[in-house]
Amino acid sequence: MKIKEIIVVEGKDDTVAIKRAVDADTIETNGSAIGDHVIEQVKLALQKRGVIIFTDPDYPGERIRKIISDKVPGCKHAFLPKEEALAKRKKGVGIEHASNESIRRALENIHEEMEAYTSEISWSDLVDAGLVGGEMAKSRRERMGKLLKIGYTNAKQLHKRLQMFQVSKESFAEAYKQVIQEERK
């Protein structure tokens, strides 16, 4: 599988994992202290070939994704479910621990940022679905993020991603229905 866009990852081990799974070029941020030279590389890559941000499904990875998204709007995003990024001995989370199949699947389901889009899904829809507050909220958001392939987030970030990736009310309702069915099992 050849990827046209340049993939932004956190480090060398992620690059090795990406290249093991697909034919692609990467830019490494080397941690969350992203220098101006990395931002310039990402801007140039976006102009020339497009960019996919593919960071670890953990707090530092999400922080890096947000920094790059804010400074270089228009990037695409790939998300890896946390359970597919766990190290063998459960010590650590990262793309470098994912299988080739998981990496390919994440890159087949990329999302594009859309600016100035008003979501069909309101904050009260999230509250009504039990995705904000309450004992089941976190697990429901985890499941929704996985089903919609937008990654796990807190409630505020979930609302933002639903808008950014223009998730339709139908897709949201379908995923929610599936979450509720799974809870009843």
Curated annotation (Swiss-Prot):
Location of this chain's protein in the cell: Cytoplasm
Gene Ontology annotations for the cellular component aspect, listed alphabetically: cytoplasm
List of residues binding Mg(2+) 2: D56, D58
Enzyme class: hydrolase
Similarity annotation: Belongs to the ribonuclease M5 family.
General function of this protein: Required for correct processing of both the 5' and 3' ends of 5S rRNA precursor. Cleaves both sides of a double-stranded region yielding mature 5S rRNA in one step.
Protein name per the record: Ribonuclease M5
